[in-house]
Amino acid sequence: MGEFINPASVPKVTFYNGVEVPCVGMGTFGSDRFTPEQVSGAVAGAIRCGYRMFDCAACYGNEDQIGQVFQDAFDEGVVERSELFIMTKVWNDMHERVEESCRKSIADLKCDYIDLFFIHWPFPNYHAPGCDVDSRNPDSKPFSAEEFIRTYRQCEELVEKGLIRNIGISNMTIPKLEAVLPLMKIQPAACEMELHPCFQQQELFDYLNDHKIQPIGFMPLGS
């Protein structure tokens, strides 16, 4: 029970496979404005308030600190692992080493599995932390369905190994989805997309729903 919100009263959506997920969660991207300690402190407060879904990512640079908050909450009896829905993502430079990335996130987040594991971006182009927003990687490559499916296959293996429960995709477009969906063995449970009143992406939203892929909006208040 949260101190301000009863988690059981939060509306839920149901994935195609029957998994229920809270409709409201907390993102943990601190950008350059908030330190890992500030973000993890906010996570601690959110858990006590009643939040049960947390959207993390390897590239955010704060999973270790957030994991300590999760561990403290488990140890103090504030919440059990089964009550949390923890999401994280493989970053662009780890597309060939997805299991390594996943295992590091599991270790950092102090949990024995990930509820929803995303491919953060559909291409392997890498930008170092702290780089200028206008910088360009000379080794950048365009989207390749073959490269993406190689990465996705590794995620499917993580499901088989019990490291993750569901696979997510992120920052996709309809043409990209049409190229890769027929090649997948395990259907993606969700697609994370920028979604707010100023950028509604209605066509993509409808496409995902038609294919039983749950849209998840990031930056819901705009950015």
What are these regions (language model features)?
Residues M1-L84, E99, Q154, E160, ...:
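N-terminal binding-site loop/beta-alpha segment at the start of enzyme catalytic domains
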Residues M26, A46, F54, I66, ...:
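Conserved, mostly hydrophobic/aromatic
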Residues Y51, C111-I114, I164, P188:
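A structural motif
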Residues V98-I119, E157-K161:
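CE4/NodB-like, metal-dependent polysaccharide N-deacetylase domain
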Residues W121-S223:
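Beta/alpha (TIM)-barrel catalytic core signal, keyed to glycine-rich beta->alpha loops juxtaposed to Asp/Glu
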